[in-house]
Structures are given as C-alpha cells and as structure tokens.
Amino acid sequence: MANPLPPPLATGTLGEILVQLRLLQFGVQAAPPIKDTGNDLVAFRGRAVRTLQVKTSANRVSRDRRLPQHYDILALVFLRSTDGVVALDSSRVFLVPRSSVNGARRNVTSLAQYELPYDNVDHSMALLARLFSPGGP
C-alpha cells in the first residue's frame, strides 16, 4: 500500500502538472528540478530558460504571497472542481512575470492578460513570446 497523498499536496501537484501540460501544448518544455531549490518548474523555449513558482488553489485564485527569492514567472492555477473532481479544461492558468507580481491583483479579471488558455492559440503564443523573449520576462 502506498502512503496517502494529503489534499494540499495533491492540489499543488495537479497545478504543477497542469502548467506543464499547458506549456507543452504551445511548444514549451517544463519539468521540476532534480533537487528542491525553491523553484517548482524549469521551462525551456528555444534557448530561453525560465524558472517558475506555481501557486494552486481550488475554486479560487491563490492569495498565497509566500514566494522564493529567485524565480522568473509566477504561475497561478485556479483548479475548477465539482464534488471533488477536478475539471482540467475548465481550470485556468495565469503566467505572471516576476516584474508584475507585486502590482498584479489576484482576481480573474485583473489577471486576464496573463492567462494561458488552452483554446486561444494566438493569445497564448503572444504571452509566451513575451515571457520567453531573449531579454527576459
């Protein structure tokens, strides 16, 4: 028998995997680092490399302000669930560059420009082009 996965750990893990999947949809590879350095994911697009911190909440946008000292992008994941079942296609991912984190309000309307929707290719590709530009996000 395996050890149980506590709900907060399951929520965070789902968020990290959803970010990886959404990024991969648009040609960005992302994976957790081998050692826990405080960054949840390292993402690659062409020659550009970015570190991501992922904050995940169920049925709301995370208000957690605890962030590591070094990261490039804050990924906020809003998991939608009904009766304990997560709907990945209805869940939302927002990629906020570190330079905008302090000024960004954590509500869906204010974060719209940072959303990485699975079904709006033009918006998602433009966002990723900005975040992974040679000069950095």
Regions found by a protein language model. Name each.
Residues M1-T37, A43-P137:
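Mixed-charge (Asp/Glu-Lys/Arg
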